[in-house]
């Protein structure tokens, strides 16, 4: 084999070994790209507040009827009230 071919193959193999297989664009993507704005408070089983440095406030809800997870619009009135109540409760501790 030619030395140039061997060198190129070695570089390609080294690049493949170094890579973790995940594209950079996926590692910084926000979990909630779309928000549901018609979710009633009574249909929510559990809320999870995601705090990531690169994304705005994100709230994920698990629904009661089908156990599905959806991203809820943080501007909903009942979400704002819930967050305010939770913050006040935490400040009193």
UniProtKB/Swiss-Prot annotation:
UniProt GO BP: ameboidal-type cell migration; blood vessel endothelial cell migration; brain development; branching involved in blood vessel morphogenesis; cell-cell adhesion; defense response; dopaminergic neuron differentiation; germ cell development
GO cellular component, one term: extracellular space
Binding site for heparin: 41-51, 62, 69, 85
Site feature location: Important for integrin interaction and activation: 45, 48, 64
Annotated CDD domains: Chemokine_CXC (cd00273)
Sequence similarity: Belongs to the intercrine alpha (chemokine CxC) family.
Protein name: Stromal cell-derived factor 1
Protein source organism: Mus musculus (Mouse)
């Amino acid at each position: 084999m030619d030395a140039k071919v061997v060198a190129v193959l070695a570089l390609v193999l080294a690049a493949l070994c170094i890579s973790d297989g995940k594209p950079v664009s996926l590692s910084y993507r926000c979990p909630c790209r779309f928000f549901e704005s018609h979710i009633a408070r009574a249909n929510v089983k559990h809320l999870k507040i995601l705090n990531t440095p690169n994304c705005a406030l994100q709230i994920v809800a698990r629904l009661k009827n089908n156990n599905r997870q959806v991203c809820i619009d943080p501007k909903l009135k009942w979400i704002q009230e819930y967050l305010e109540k939770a913050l006040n409760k935490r400040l009193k501790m």
